[in-house]
Amino acid sequence: MANAKEIKTKIASVQNTQKITSAMEMVAASKMRKAQDRMASSRPYAENMRKVIGHVAQGSLEYKHPYLEVREAKRVGYIVVSTDRGLCGGLNVNLFKKVVADVKKQREAGAEVEFCPIGARSVQFFNSFGGQVSAHASGLGDAPKLADLIGTVRVMLQAYNEGKLDRLYVVFNKFVNTMSQTPVIEQLLPLPKSEEDEISHHWDYLYEPDPKELLDTLLVRYVESQVYQGVVENIASEQAARMVAMKAATDNAGELISDLELVYNKARQAAITQELSEIVSGAAAV
């Protein structure tokens, strides 16, 4: 058993760690609320844009945009959104596992894959994973802007336009609630059809000035908005996961301190008992 002084030093060390994790928990909670506000603001736009584009994909236009044409998936691209920092539980690990499982299926089907990692952890992982990394972005901060992503996303769009990609997906952690964040893979290109219009499609939009001019701009904007929404959702998920992880660390530190204090008291009691025994033995000898 360690002596009382060593145990006391250990208790002080754990208490200092507990203060740090408690502070990180509070910071993460504050950042999560801000991230939730940004997510709530952008989510209706992204969801409605998805519905509109899904309806367009069901339509019978004379002009067929390349993003509406389904091609054989010989080469698949993934835009993978992760965090820049750690200390957020298994958030990134679970995301990467999902991507790796999907990549395995694509490769078994004979497709080649390439990646566009967003976030330092994603960049680090896919640089060592294998497969072409066509573009990347990191250091976006807690309040990213769409302009920060446009250059990276358009590298993948250019590859799709040139026929170097036949499928394009975005992968991120979808924020469900504070305790639950789910890794998802969503198809960006070719445009997925709207589930609501899958059974019946009895109306269509009127396009002004003409479908080509409108769709050439709208469809690019759609892809950018979906990636941005993925980034915003991932940030909210990151802060929620970090808050939960830091709370667990703080609680564990508290339990460890209690256990160490018990050990300290036993060690102190043993030392006192030893001293008393020595005193009694000395007195008896006299």
Curated annotation (Swiss-Prot):
Share an example GO biological-process annotation for this protein. proton motive force-driven plasma membrane ATP synthesis
Q: Which residues form a coiled coil?
A: none
Q: Which domain of life is it from?
A: Bacteria
**An example Gene Ontology CC term for this record:** plasma membrane
Major location (coarse): membrane
Is Ion transport tagged as a keyword? yes
Q: Name one GO molecular function term.
A: proton-transporting ATP synthase activity, rotational mechanism
Q: Does the keyword Membrane apply?
A: yes
In what way does this protein cross or attach to the membrane? Peripheral membrane protein
For this UniProt record, the keywords arranged alphabetically read as follows: ATP synthesis, Cell inner membrane, Cell membrane, CF(1), Hydrogen ion transport, Ion transport, Membrane, Transport
Query: Which locations, inside or outside the cell, does it occupy?
Result: Cell inner membrane
Family per record? Belongs to the ATPase gamma chain family.
Q: How does it assemble?
A: F-type ATPases have 2 components, CF(1) - the catalytic core - and CF(0) - the membrane proton channel. CF(1) has five subunits: alpha(3), beta(3), gamma(1), delta(1), epsilon(1). CF(0) has three main subunits: a, b and c.
Q: Briefly state the protein's biological role.
A: Produces ATP from ADP in the presence of a proton gradient across the membrane. The gamma chain is believed to be important in regulating ATPase activity and the flow of protons through the CF(0) complex.
Q: What is this protein called?
A: ATP synthase gamma chain
Write down the species.
Shewanella woodyi (strain ATCC 51908 / MS32)
